[in-house]
Amino acid sequence: TEEYAMCFKKGNELRDEFNTALAELKEDGTLDEIMSNYIGDEVGQHPYESPADVDRSNGTLTMATNAEFEPWEYKEGTDIVGIDADISQAICDKLGYELKIEDMAFETILASVNSGKADFGAAGMTVTPEREESVDFTDTYANATQVVIVRK
């Protein structure tokens, strides 16, 4: 089982704010709704929409991702959509930020976060001891199991 979380430059206090928002999204059912819009029997039935009265006065946060891992993040036309995009938007809605998503090679996400080019990374990213040496992760927001299917 893999644990997915968002990554931040070490010591970035924004991670704690994200953890608080993630806990609220888990508690109020928003996280489950976002997941069910992409995985399971209700795909497409629960699209996330930002509340009309969202205050975005805290500025813009840039999310580094690799939009090639459907349903976590992928392109629909020129838009980057998916579970991570929706969760990140929901968090930014709670915290008062505009969200900007930057698509890049997966292997450059950590460097982008550490250099300040991006505020955080979200890309179906598995928490590993090696990655924890260079970035701080939020609390886990999803677990995934990878399997191989072979023909009998």
Please provide the spans of the model-predicted regions.
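Ligand-binding "clamshell"
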Residues: 1-9, 44-50, 129-144
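A structure-centric signal for secondary-structure junctions around beta-strands
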Residues: 2-3, 58-60, 69, 143-145
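Short, well-ordered beta-strand segments
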Residues: 7, 61-65, 149
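A mature extracytoplasmic/lumenal domain signature
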Residues: 10, 22, 65-67, 103-106, ...
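Extracytoplasmic small-molecule ligand-binding "clamshell" domains
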Residues: 28, 33, 58-125, 133
